[in-house]
């Protein structure tokens, strides 16, 4: 601390005092105010009232109290990113969640996987510096489609599957300079926030900008009083490559962090994020674009335009969009040039909406089930009810978004009334969808009527058949790709786990794979510990899966106790016969004593 040209080292004096009192304050640390008061008392005694120590502590206490905790268990930095994922693998994942949009899923899976695999290839072969800035064209993507067709949903799924940070912004909220709305570079800073401050991880993230058609500078669009072309120009550098400063002059937190960094190191450090590997995906409905495409096709006299005109469908025209159409729509050529990949989403019809609701991975139905489960009520839907809900949603002309309001309108009364009753289950049938108020009234008047239970069991059985069919299809795909076989018992176990709300189908298979690794680990551990080899047969694995998924038995603890309990019996057989390899069956899992007793009796019966 500088005082009139001299340097007073408080730390050395405080260290001696701290050592002397270590026994008294071992478990008690002074808070900020106490520390500030003690230091000021010391300075006052030493130099009088001429010197005061002011400590500005604007950081929330909670932030200071945070430890490493569970964060140590999470993959750090880029290690969590799946750089080597193949397009077909990602497309298969999307097929389980996203209905229709075959072409969009194919293009997105291919180009996004290529983007990250190219990054991996360049870095593994140390080519980043060699070709830095030379011929680097990112697979930035433009998605065209109406509201409610799954544009945002599909990008969120991809980001989650790949393990990359993801942020979404609205193009209408940004301006060229930041005077109105936000600065486009704020999206890059938000990406660092989503990456928990990990700049390296953020540099491989995905930035998704919706409503991009609203910044087209064409006269037929009415928007906020800002320069739309200016916003386009502001996006040019981030979409290609630039360095974005994390600290901005008007941000007090950034200023505070810079001061603290300078206080600690005596150096001014500028934290920047390079956008070279950040993937930009933009989307919009682009109403009116089909007219531009139609004029171009007609002027060119393309042979298939007659067929398109007969369909009178804007989405047929959008399939033929070109860069020149987007430029005429109001985008600058430099902006369009940074979006080399164009994807057109299909509109959703009634059957598509029905398939969305029917899909066990549907967030709409699963979310509503969780809402009722929070009150201890088990909610099930009949297939006919899902069809009626889809028909109602289609009338709203808002795509999949209409499904949410359709379900809410039907079930709102039940969600309000049933938590105050003893009702523990509800079947959403065609009858309920047609007359929700009447059905609710009859249920409240006679909740113990066997009719309600019969309807619930019917819905549950329908759902079980649908889920089992989808789990079996997924299992067949595993067999085809990996050679792994699944018994009917294991398929039924996974289906029941999904039905009970334990996980969606992909997650259930991930957990099964993890469980199988745990089983093999304990087999190896038993050999290392006791010099005896044990192997669980397929029936035993099925039974362990049932215990883990349906009976909620912790598998690690269960397997450790099971094998330790089996060791004396197996050791006895080994000592008598020399046998050192054993096959454990489902009986060993359920009744290890009976299993070992039978093995010992079989041994003595031979002699």
Segments predicted by a language model, with ranges:
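Non-catalytic accessory segments flanking P-loop/AAA+ NTPase cores
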Residues: 2-607
């Amino acid at each position: 601390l500088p005082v009139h040209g001299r340097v007073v080292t408080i730390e050395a004096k405080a260290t001696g005092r701290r050592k002397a009192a270590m026994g008294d304050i071992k478990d008690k640390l002074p808070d900020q105010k106490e520390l500030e008061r003690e230091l000021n008392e010391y300075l006052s005694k030493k130099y009088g009232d001429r010197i005061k120590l002011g400590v500005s502590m604007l950081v929330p206490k909670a932030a200071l109290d945070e430890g490493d905790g569970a964060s140590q268990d999470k993959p750090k930095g880029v290690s969590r990113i799946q750089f080597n994922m193949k397009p077909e693998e990602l497309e298969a994942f999307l097929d389980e969640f996203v209905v229709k949009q075959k072409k969009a899923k194919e293009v997105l899976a291919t180009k996004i996987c290529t983007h990250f695999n190219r990054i991996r290839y360049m870095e593994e072969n140390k080519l980043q510096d060699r070709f830095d800035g030379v011929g680097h064209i990112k697979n930035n993507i433009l998605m065209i489609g109406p509201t409610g067709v799954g544009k945002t949903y599909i990008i969120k799924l991809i980001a989650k599957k790949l393990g990359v940070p993801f942020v979404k912004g609205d193009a209408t909220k940004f301006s060229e300079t930041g005077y109105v709305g936000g600065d486009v570079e704020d999206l890059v800073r938000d990406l660092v926030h989503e990456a928990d401050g990990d700049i390296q991880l953020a540099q491989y993230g995905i930035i998704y900008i919706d409503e991009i058609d609203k910044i087209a500078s064409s006269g037929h669009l009415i928007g906020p009083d800002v320069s739309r072309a200016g916003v386009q120009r502001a996006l040019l550098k981030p979409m290609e490559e630039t360095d974005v400063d994390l600290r901005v002059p008007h941000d007090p937190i950034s200023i505070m962090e810079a001061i603290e960094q300078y206080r600690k190191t005596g150096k001014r450090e500028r934290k920047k994020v390079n956008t070279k590997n950040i993937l930009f995906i933009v989307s919009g409905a682009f109403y009116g674009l089909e007219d531009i495409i139609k004029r171009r096709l007609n002027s060119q006299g393309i042979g298939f335009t007659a067929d398109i005109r007969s369909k009178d469908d804007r989405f047929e025209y959008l399939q033929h969009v070109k860069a020149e159409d987007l430029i005429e729509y109001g985008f600058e050529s430099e902006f369009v040039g940074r979006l080399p990949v164009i994807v057109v989403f299909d509109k959703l019809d009634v059957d598509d909406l029905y398939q969305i609701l029917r899909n066990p991975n549907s967030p709409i139905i699963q979310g509503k089930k969780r809402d009722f489960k929070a009150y201890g009520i088990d909610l099930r839907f009949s297939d006919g009810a899902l069809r009626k809900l889809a028909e109602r949603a289609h009338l709203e002309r808002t795509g999949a978004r209409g499904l949410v309001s359709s379900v809410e309108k039907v079930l709102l009364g039940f969600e309000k009334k049933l938590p105050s009753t003893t009702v523990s289950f509800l079947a959403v049938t065609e009858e309920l969808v047609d007359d929700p108020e009447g059905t609710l009234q009859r249920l409240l008047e006679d909740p113990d009527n066997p009719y309600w239970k019969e309807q619930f069991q019917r819905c549950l059985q329908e759902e079980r058949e649908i889920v089992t069919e989808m789990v079996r299809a997924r299992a067949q795909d595993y067999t085809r790709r990996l050679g792994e076989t699944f018994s009917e018992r294991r398929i039924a176990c996974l289906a029941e786990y999904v039905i009970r709300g334990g996980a969606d189908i992909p997650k259930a298979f991930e957990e099964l794979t993890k469980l199988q690794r745990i089983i093999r680990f304990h087999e190896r551990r038993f050999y290392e510990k006791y010099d005896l080899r044990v192997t669980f047969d397929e029936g035993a694995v099925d039974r362990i899966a049932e215990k883990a998924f349906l009976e909620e038995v912790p598998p690690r603890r269960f397997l450790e106790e099971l094998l330790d309990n089996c060791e004396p019996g197996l050791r006895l057989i080994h000592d008598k016969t020399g046998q050192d390899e054993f096959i454990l069956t489902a009986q060993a899992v359920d009744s290890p004593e009976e299993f070992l007793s039978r093995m010992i009796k079989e041994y003595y019966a031979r002699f």
